[in-house]
Amino acid sequence: MSLHIHRPHGHTVAQTLLALLCALLAMLFTFSLAGCNRVADAAPSSDHTAVPVRVPNDEIVGQEVAVLTEAPNVPPAITRTHATRVIVNLDVIEKTMRLADGVDYTMWTFGGSMPGRFIRVREGDQVELHLKNDEHSTMPHNIDLHAVTGPGGGAKSSLTIPGGESVFTFAALNPGLYVYHCATAPVPMHIANGMYGMILVEPKAGLPKVDREFYVMQSEFYTHGKFGEKGLQTLDMEKGIDERPTYVVFNGAVGSLTGDKALQAKVGERVRLFVGNGGPNLVSSFHVIGEVFDNVYTEGGTVASQHNVQTTLVPAGGSAVVEFGVEKPGDLILVDHSIFRAFNKGALGMLHVSGDDNAKVFASLKGLGGTH
């Protein structure tokens, strides 16, 4: 792994020193954790069995720049049959964004969107990740990808001051759907302010063909103001520590998947949802009202281990992949079925299904007024 940090153009000496101090503290925090891990690793074991070290042996052919997408969009499925070098360019941007109607929040983002950009690579690829921290950022940032086998998931090699850039490489060894997030101290603050996203490592054989793929990520916000209180809101650390979120939302805002922003599908199509949970605290009880999941890839693994599932748990810092066919037109409702979160804190979205009706699937025979 390699690391490059430079002093940003236009910053005063004081600003640069402050950023360096923050970076030093974050590095000390990271190194202390690494030291603890080394002590644990060094402990003797009486029944130690050698585990073969996995060495990437895929021939790397050429290179390409990764297509990164904003939620709910997903990059196209990978059609190549060989491993390649994938260049991922990811910018950290701190910006004020809408959290709810009349409510703003200064989000710390990967790529300027909430959640962070969706990254799609193939098992066996060599990934070269360039992390740039915007010169107007107030903090150093880094990235920990749960798909990475290496120190801190990349965090140790990517600590980046405002205006700087870090570069590291990793082999995409394990297929699956993974969360990535900032791991700069204080880690809970960075995650609570929006620093998370998803990376999909497609299996070499690819995924089963579907008609639609969407990116949905749940998370919480802990604001000083009450739910719906107007104006610019800021992080309430005490609420975060006590796990009392003001908002629980999909894709970074109340209403991000409703109205004209609702997901779209047609009768007869198969839908795949890549579902993530940025946390920082809660486990999601993910459910789609009006549908049953035909296949669930539990915790983002590559095997559809469950079928005909009503609700699946998505842990903080974890994921799930769900697939289902849509047989009936109308609005399907995405919720966290810890139901107060859906109707009182914002964890609610819609999938609008258009097409011909099918009374054999469902028909209303008697309305509220007693008419047929």
PLM feature spans:
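Intrinsically disordered, low-complexity terminal tails
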Residues: 1-3, 33-37
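Bacterial N-terminal signal peptides
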Residues: 19-32
